[in-house]
């Protein structure tokens, strides 16, 4: 089976940098994969992607060594199993609040006896090569999101759940959980303190920690802190920001940001 070099990096305490994809374009996915990211995450929760889009985008990504990851729309075993059968090497599960919900995510990612995943890997065997059924339980990354007040109360039980490979912070929903305004890359002291607490708890439990960013500044900050899975930006975000800046420069000679919109997606 083709190894999951991203999961190997996390297990070896090495960082990885990826990008978020919310535009339904296999060409965009292929382009960003060839840019050299460690992984690309296809967003079925907030992106405009359905299963057919995700399958085509993963096929495009497979022309490179970039690892395909999918954020499913919900903690639903059917959704998780379906994208794994299509070739995802990792699943990001949103809004996980407690140990029971973490176990639900894990068991959907694992074949028996470790889980309840139904056997029918379909395209996954074309991507992975021989040995998928035997090795998948050790190569598929299960990533659960920490982004609610309930999850913050249950960090230890979530992170100690066997089979959880990483936790991933959604900064905007985390801001809601802290009664703060969502603002993308967030410098509010309470937000910063909470992000650090989540990271340190993950380190204590020996699992990887990830976080969404929209800038080089915050990406470098989080890498320096010890995050293993850092999102540098998104297809939609890069396209919109650069287009806006170039247009403003052409019209006014001003290259500064023209919007307070900090949308990651």
Please tell me what each predicted stretch does:
Residues 1-265:
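Expand to "…catalyze enediolate/carbanion chemistry for C-C bond making/breaking, isomerization
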